[in-house]
Swiss-Prot record:
Family annotation (SUPFAM superfamilies): 5' to 3' exonuclease, C-terminal subdomain (SSF47807), PIN domain-like (SSF88723)
A Pfam family that the UniProt record links to this protein: 5_3_exonuc
CDD domains documented for this protein: H3TH_53EXO, PIN_53EXO
Residue ranges constituting the 5'-3' exonuclease domain according to the UniProt record: 176-269
Full protein name: 5'-3' exonuclease
GO molecular function terms attached to this record: 5'-3' exonuclease activity; 5'-flap endonuclease activity; DNA binding
Length: 291
């Protein structure tokens, strides 16, 4: 069976930047180009490529354009801090370096990087290709299935935790991947500014889903709930369904590139070395020059 690696570009670029943010101050002090995210992201992705024999490789990014989620819910992600300008200027170079490494780098207006990952994951598994997804975003856990594993960064840029069908319940509150969006519909998600239902915390949300399975089934059994829960949930099904929908990753968008274009390409060594030299990333330049 062939293997695909799908990477959440925004998520890992953020992690690469903030794991090495001290180097930004050094660059400012010495009037050097910002390169910490470029170097760290490139090294992370190179190491991931060495971890398994991958046949396909896709790295997805968000665009600046509003998504369908923004149009449905104006408060979506509204509390997130602005991306540091020192990272923003590195993102185009990060993308260029990853193309030189052999990845298909993609983005589509109207959708988030997660939606591209979800749609490429579905495309791969439909073609009997096993998928590894790398991110620090727990939203992607909903994509775990018999052919798809999700690896989340848990510490810095090196420590990863794998979620698969064998260990998922143990690592995610006893729930299933399909219940991730049900959980977010009830409990919410602060990182995306999804409030969930006021009065339903993680423990109560988990208990309800373990007993009833889905939001629809919880409300179908409304009369069996305690009076306290009935008071909390009264008239809230539309709210829960809205936040569940907003948390759902699309797996059926029309992709700009097909599976053939997602095949990993040979490293463009010359272009990569020129980029590393331009941005003063000498140690990596030396490493890749020896390949």
């Amino acid at each position: 069976m062939k293997n695909a690696i799908l990477i959440d570009g925004n998520s890992l670029a953020y992690r690469a930047y903030f794991a090495t943010w001290q180097q930004v101050e050094f660059a400012k002090l010495h009037n050097l180009p910002f390169n910490n995210a470029i170097r760290t992201m490139l090294m992370m992705c190179w190491n991931l490529l060495q971890s398994k024999q991958y046949d396909y490789g896709v790295i997805s990014f968000d665009t600046k354009a509003p998504t369908f989620r923004d149009q449905l819910y104006s408060e979506y992600k509204s509390k997130r801090s602005k991306t540091p300008s020192e990272l923003l200027v590195q993102i185009p170079v990060v993308k260029e370096s990853l193309r030189h490494l052999g990845f298909l780098v993609c983005e589509q207006d109207g959708f988030e990087a997660d939606d591209l990952i979800g749609s490429y994951a579905r495309l791969m598994t439909q073609n009997n290709v096993a998928v590894d997804i790398y991110s620090s975003d727990r939203d992607l856990l909903q994509l775990v299935d018999s052919m798809t594993s999700v690896w989340l960064c848990v510490k810095g840029t090196k420590e990863m935790k794998e979620y698969n069908t064998d260990n998922f319940a143990e690592q995610f509150f006893g729930l299933t991947p399909k219940q991730v969006i049900e959980y977010k519909g009830l409990v919410g998600d602060n990182s995306d500014n999804l409030t969930g239902i006021k009065g339903i915390g993680p423990k109560k949300g988990i208990d309800l889903l373990k007993q009833y399975g889905t939001i629809d089934n919880i409300f179908a059994n409304f009369d069996k709930l305690s009076k306290a829960l009935q008071t909390i949930l009264q008239g809230q099904i539309d709210t829960a369904k809205k936040f569940s929908f907003l948390a759902s990753i699309k797996t059926d968008i029309k992709l700009n590139d097909d599976i053939v274009h997602a095949a990993l390409k040979p490293i463009d060594k010359q272009a990569l070395l020129e980029l590393l030299d331009k941005y003063g990333i000498k140690a990596l330049a030396q490493k890749f020059s020896q390949l």
